[in-house]
Amino acid sequence: MNMTINEDALNWYKEELDLESGDQVRFFVRYGGCSNVQKGFSLGVAKDAPQEAGVTAEADGITFFIEESDLWYFDNHDLLVSYSEDADEPVFEYQ
């Protein structure tokens, strides 16, 4: 599995989470919400340090990661995190 954070999404996260180079951001599975890959689950986001990262992506010195224990959620899809100007929020695309 691969994870990509595009530049517009990176800038949104930097502003919203007050991120700096060296920070770490976790994408985690949460119950509820809406997803194209796992019904009844969605992704949450938090500043956190990895315990057992399964996938990482670095952008502008910031490490984005998904724990090994959450990889089931992606069902062998790659994750592209982009940004929607209309919604003014990141968009998760499963490829």
Curated annotation (Swiss-Prot):
Function: Acts as an inhibitor of the pyruvate dehydrogenase. Overexpression does not affect growth with glucose as the main carbon source, but it leads to a dramatic growth defect when cells are grown with pyruvate as the sole carbon source.
Disruption phenotype: Knockout mutant does not have growth defects compared to the wild-type when grown with glucose as the main carbon source.
Signal peptide as annotated in the record: none
Family: Belongs to the HesB/IscA family.
InterPro entries membership: FeS_biogenesis, HesB-like_dom_sf, PdhI-like
Annotated source species: Bacillus subtilis (strain 168)
Protein name in UniProt: Pyruvate dehydrogenase inhibitor
Residues spanning the membrane: none
Subunit architecture: Interacts with the E1 module of pyruvate dehydrogenase (PdhA-PdhB).
Origin: domain of life: Bacteria
Organism lineage: Bacteria, Bacillati, Bacillota, Bacilli, Bacillales
Pfam family membership, one: Fe-S_biosyn
